[in-house]
Amino acid sequence: MRSDFAEFRELVALPGESFNPIEAAFLIAMDEYPKLSAARCGRLMAEMKNEAEEHMRSLQGRSAKRAKGPEVIAQVEHFNKLFFETWGFHGNNDEYYDPRNSFLNDVIDRRTGIPISLTLLYVDIARGGAAIEVIPVGMPGHFLAGFNAREDLYIDVFGQGAFLTLPECAKRAESIIPELIFEPGHMYRVGPRVIVARMLRNLINIYINEENFPKALHS
């Protein structure tokens, strides 16, 4: 990255909770799309969060609020209807290695992406708009959303919001990496800086596989 590099570096240098992975992801996209403005990026997120809040209010008959226990699952199911059915977000199985799957503006415009970009978007809107306490979770070969309060259930955003138990995650991981001997420790909460670093690595690997070395170096 060169364009917007100074702003990106300043953002990465921010301490702890001040670092915003959504903002960083949009800066990565702005490097690819110089005409993409920060104002448009912010507007896109604000509009979706507002719609998510209204959606939860209309379904629950009250303002969106933080839920606990079984009510969280019901809230996730309600939010999933908006995210996957109304908005039409889905995993891009057909063009998994298309670089556009890693640019957040493209993910929003095209309604498709890869596990990490879809989950980043899902978690941010769920937390900021639908008031659902979900977190990003890494596992071997895949990326999920999970819950702060429990480690036995996960959300496969790439898989249209399907709930996965820990044994199902183990089966999925071992199907992706046959030599893997799965352990519960393979499921881990992913910090915001790690998410952005993984998104950049994905782009670099895609460009290397395409033998687009100038792009790989630029990223």
Stretch-by-stretch model annotation:
Residues 1-219:
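A structural boundary/capping signal
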